[in-house]
């Protein structure tokens, strides 16, 4: 399970880590805040450590220790940002929050510490030391805020097998959609053909009905003509029969007259 961080948070936190490392390891900065050695010379210019050490048997400065811690934390976070597992990022983030809480507690204890028999200059440098200490604690806040958004805006990068599986799934889905579209087109085409056939059948039915109606009228006319022809023939036959009957009647009359004579 690989995780990839959004480039915005990752890039800015890495640049911030580089800046914090550079700030924590400036030699002149350490010559001022580090209690050992007591004096530091650069090109004949002597820098005397302003922080009083007569009340500390360890001869150590809190701000110097804190600066070293910040530098190491920045270096560790710079390389830890290459981790893409969300569980590891959450664990490191919790450790950072716990460390920040302990540093705040140490800063409060350093503030509540009381010194006696110190000069005004030493008191002034004491407050400068506290100011540096709080400032160095505040330098961890971007990691806390950025780490929160870093963990929140983590999205997953699938493995090669999952990509292949997802690609295969997409291809199968594309084939299925294409097949459904072809079937839908076929159904639409079939429905259009059915509608067209129905329209053609209705047109043919109408034509058949018109043709049958025309045939019916033609048959009626033909029957009427036959009836007329039959009537004419009957009338002609009747007329011939009448003529024949009249002829026979005349012949009989002529024959009877001849017999009487």
Swiss-Prot record:
Top-rank taxon, per record: Eukaryota
Transmembrane segments: 15-35, 87-107, 131-151
Annotated keywords: Membrane, Transmembrane, Transmembrane helix
Membrane topology: Multi-pass membrane protein
Membrane in keyword set: yes
Region of interest called Disordered, as start-end residue ranges on this chain: 234-261
Compartment(s) where it occurs, according to its Swiss-Prot or TrEMBL record: Membrane
Record flagged with keyword Transmembrane: yes
GO cellular component, one term: membrane
Biased composition (Basic and acidic residues): 234-246
Protein name per Swiss-Prot or TrEMBL: Uncharacterized protein F07F6.2
Lineage of origin: Eukaryota, Metazoa, Ecdysozoa, Nematoda, Chromadorea
